[in-house]
């Protein structure tokens, strides 16, 4: 079973011999299969820096990250990333975009296309597999990005504000899609957002981070994602008095620590 361990992680920004900024300070976090962890906090609290370290895009200044006991020293196929901007290749078809990671790993075209169509079906886009991505709406492009991240069957899904640029209705539909995929595949998910409501709805565990330097100020274990999987009614979940109480408490906490 996969386990992601973040042990006393600190990150300094700056140049050798010059002034440095402590972006993250002594972050400790453990995630196991089926955990959906959401990081929430004011701008500058280190959320994206933390995700970049987990992805292997950055090296920590102190501490380490381990995936199933192995220290993370760079990007790897066991960690899929979905960015705020979809980062798709506009000259490729939808299916070829989804299959890109498999192509780079030397997988045969027949197998790449089989997996691409399977993952596109999972996000409701199998009918547009042959289209160029520039013909798709923003929400559809982001679903292609999710399918691409799933194509290599990663143990960990890293999602850096993937819904921030979408309209409210599209955002809600993709939130529901993400939870259904998580419930089915039981991957570790680490998700960044600025939306308190989105964080409460998606997270099984919510970490609220403080800035200057970035630290985990508070951790919440939450029931709402699993409630949605059971009932399928997002509006009912978000209208629950317990959901509203958590929302107000967390907004107050973020204001107090910003």
UniProtKB/Swiss-Prot annotation:
SMART domains: AAA
PROSITE patterns given in the database record: ABC_TRANSPORTER_1, ABC_TRANSPORTER_2, TAUB
The keyword tRNA-binding appears for this protein: no
EC numbers for this chain: 7.6.2.7
Record domain ABC transporter: where: 4-236
Primary enzyme class: translocase
GO molecular function, one term: ATP binding
InterPro entries (UniProt xref): AAA+_ATPase (IPR003593), ABC_transporter-like_ATP-bd (IPR003439), ABC_transporter-like_CS (IPR017871), ABC_transporter_ATP-bind (IPR050166), P-loop_NTPase (IPR027417)
UniProt key word Ribosomal protein: no
A single GO cellular-component term on record: plasma membrane
CDD domains to which the protein is assigned, alphabetical: ABC_NrtD_SsuB_transporters
The protein's role, per its UniProt record: Part of the ABC transporter complex TauABC involved in taurine import. Responsible for energy coupling to the transport system.
Record note on quaternary structure: The complex is composed of two ATP-binding proteins (TauB), two transmembrane proteins (TauC) and a solute-binding protein (TauA).
Family to which the UniProt record says this protein belongs: Belongs to the ABC transporter superfamily. Taurine importer (TC 3.A.1.17.1) family.
Protein name per Swiss-Prot or TrEMBL: Taurine import ATP-binding protein TauB
Species the sequence originates in: Cupriavidus necator (strain ATCC 17699 / DSM 428 / KCTC 22496 / NCIMB 10442 / H16 / Stanier 337) (Ralstonia eutropha)
């Amino acid at each position: 079973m996969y386990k992601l361990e973040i042990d006393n992680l600190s990150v300094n920004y700056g140049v050798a011999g010059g002034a440095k900024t402590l972006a993250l300070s002594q972050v400790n976090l453990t995630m196991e299969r089926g955990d959906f962890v959401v990081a929430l906090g004011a701008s500058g609290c280190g959320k994206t820096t933390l995700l970049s370290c987990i992805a292997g895009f950055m090296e920590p200044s102190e501490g380490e990250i381990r995936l199933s006991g192995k220290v993370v020293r760079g990007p790897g196929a066991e960690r899929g990333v979905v960015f705020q901007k979809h980062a798709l290749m506009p000259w490729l078809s939808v299916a070829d975009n989804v299959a890109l990671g498999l192509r780079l790993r030397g997988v045969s075209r027949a197998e790449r296309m089989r997996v691409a169509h399977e993952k596109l079906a999972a996000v409701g886009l199998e009918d547009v597999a042959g289209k160029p991505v520039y013909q798709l709406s923003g929400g559809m492009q982001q679903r292609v990005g999710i399918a691409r991240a799933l194509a290599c069957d990663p143990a960990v899904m890293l999602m850096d504000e993937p819904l921030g640029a979408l309209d409210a209705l599209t955002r809600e539909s993709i939130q529901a899609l993400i939870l259904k995929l998580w419930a089915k595949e039981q991957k570790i998910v680490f998700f960044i957002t600025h939306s308190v409501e989105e964080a409460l709805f998606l997270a099984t565990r919510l970490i609220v981070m403080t800035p200057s330097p970035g630290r985990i100020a508070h951790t919440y274990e939450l029931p709402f994602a699993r409630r949605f999987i059971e009932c399928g009614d997002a509006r009912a979940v978000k209208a629950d008095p317990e959901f509203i109480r958590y929302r107000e408490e967390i907004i107050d906490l973020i204001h107090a620590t910003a």
